[in-house]
């Protein structure tokens, strides 16, 4: 039930603003990197809703392709095209892709890199998971940001983003739990000064 003002209108300050989270998907998306963080955001929303509160996250799954196959061979469809613009408070999640993290020659990969260059701005939050950082590096998004990647791709990342440093870029690599650890703190950022609370 919405809180009402004295004039009978919804009190906008009492209705939390759901943060738009955009998962950028590519061919051979590493399934765990997609499902793990998405489930954390979903569970956070479900917990809040069980307490009668509004959800914190509004997830969007986007791609330059109309369909794709994940790392485990399961096909994905039904996601949205890359949007023409992103809201100022958006979070963009870049996940790893098995066997294609160093290949950006396909039409879809080039479109994805070009879209990231056009759309991602300093006001946005960027989360890279494992070799999702390589995609961010290709798009020139890591200058002035903190990042890491799988050790086998570390030198390539340094070459792509020589000016990367401490910033607002949660990034995970290494063991399986790291995928989840990168997403777990995100609900707490909802209270930070950097994101609006309503």
Task: Name each region found by the language model.
Residues 174-198:
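Conserved anion/nucleotide-ligand pocket segment
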Residues 134-140, 173-174, 189:
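Acidic/polar active-site rim loop that often engages polyanionic ligands
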Residues 1-126, 136-138, 193, 197:
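Extended, subdomain-level signal for the structured scaffold at the beginning of enzyme domains
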Residues 136-151, 179-181:
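Short beta-strand and adjoining strand-loop segment in the mid-core
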Residues 113, 150-154, 189-193:
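Hydrophobic, well-ordered secondary-structure segments
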Residues 126-127, 148, 167, 180:
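Structural detector of well-ordered beta-strand residues that form the stable sheet scaffold
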Residues 143-171:
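A conserved active-site-flanking secondary-structure segment within enzyme catalytic domains
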């Amino acid at each position: 039930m919405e809180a009402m003002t004295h004039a009978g209108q919804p009190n906008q300050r009492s209705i939390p603003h759901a943060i738009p989270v955009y998962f950028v998907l590519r061919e051979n998306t590493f399934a765990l990197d997609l499902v793990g963080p998405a489930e954390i955001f979903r569970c956070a929303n479900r917990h809040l809703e069980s307490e009668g509160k509004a959800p914190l996250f509004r997830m969007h799954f986007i791609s330059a392709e109309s369909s794709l196959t994940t790392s485990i061979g399961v096909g994905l469809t039904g996601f949205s095209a890359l949007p023409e613009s992103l809201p100022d408070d958006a979070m963009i999640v870049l996940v790893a892709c098995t066997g294609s993290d160093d290949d950006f020659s396909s039409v879809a990969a080039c479109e994805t890199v070009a879209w990231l260059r056009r759309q991602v701005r300093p006001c946005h939050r960027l989360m890279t998971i494992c070799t999702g950082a390589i995609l961010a590096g290709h798009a020139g998004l890591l200058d002035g940001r903190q990042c890491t990647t799988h050790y086998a791709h570390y030198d390539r990342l340094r070459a792509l983003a020589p000016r990367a440093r401490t910033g607002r870029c949660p990034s995970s690599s290494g063991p399986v739990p790291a995928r989840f650890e990168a997403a777990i703190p995100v609900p707490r950022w909802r209270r930070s000064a950097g994101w609006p609370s309503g």
